[in-house]
Amino acid sequence: MRDNHYKLFAREDEKARQRFERDIVRMIRQLYNCPCIGLWVPFNEGWGQFDALRITDIVRKADPTRPVDHASGWFDQGGGDVRSVHNYFRPLKVEKDNRAFVISEYGGINCQIPEHSMSSEVYGYHQTSEEEFPGAFTDMMKTVQGLVSDGLCAAVYTQVSDIEEETNGLLTYDRKARKA
């Protein structure tokens, strides 16, 4: 899907798009010397995405030293330096592309430990018990490691710790219990 359908992406307001362009350049200039930033991601999962190819050019001009994931996870426009996929439901695999292939979100193994949770509500993609979580996580890591020989360049497990209703972290919300 092309990302110039501004209404569909909730970007009808031209002034808001202009502010985004101004602010992303300001942000890059402010954070340019932070060594922990390895990659710029102007759009994640289509939230407010618009003109990603043109925005990638703006980002590259502001910082030509770092790669760009122009549209992380969803509405890939064929630009940027990586092909970025979010995959919680399908078998993990490498898709062939001329860019580096990255599984930029995967995991979602839900394991709620009630006494360490923020909420009684739970959200996750694969339900497990406290006893099952370490094995499920290890199996997923083995699958990801096996994809390196197929061309996988990076992978990001979601997520390090539980947040409010999402209990798919390696640590609980209060950081007092480690699940794997």
Regions found by a protein language model. Name each.
Residues 1-82, 91-97:
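Active-site mouth of glycoside hydrolases
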Residues 47-51, 57-60, 79, 88, ...:
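Solvent-exposed, non-transmembrane amphipathic alpha-helical segments
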Residues 72, 86-87, 105, 174:
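Residues at the C-termini of beta-strands that transition into short coil/loop
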Residues 67, 82-84, 102, 169:
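Generic structural signal for residues positioned in beta-strands
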Residues 47, 75, 89-90, 107-110, ...:
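Short, solvent-exposed loop/turn segments at secondary-structure junctions
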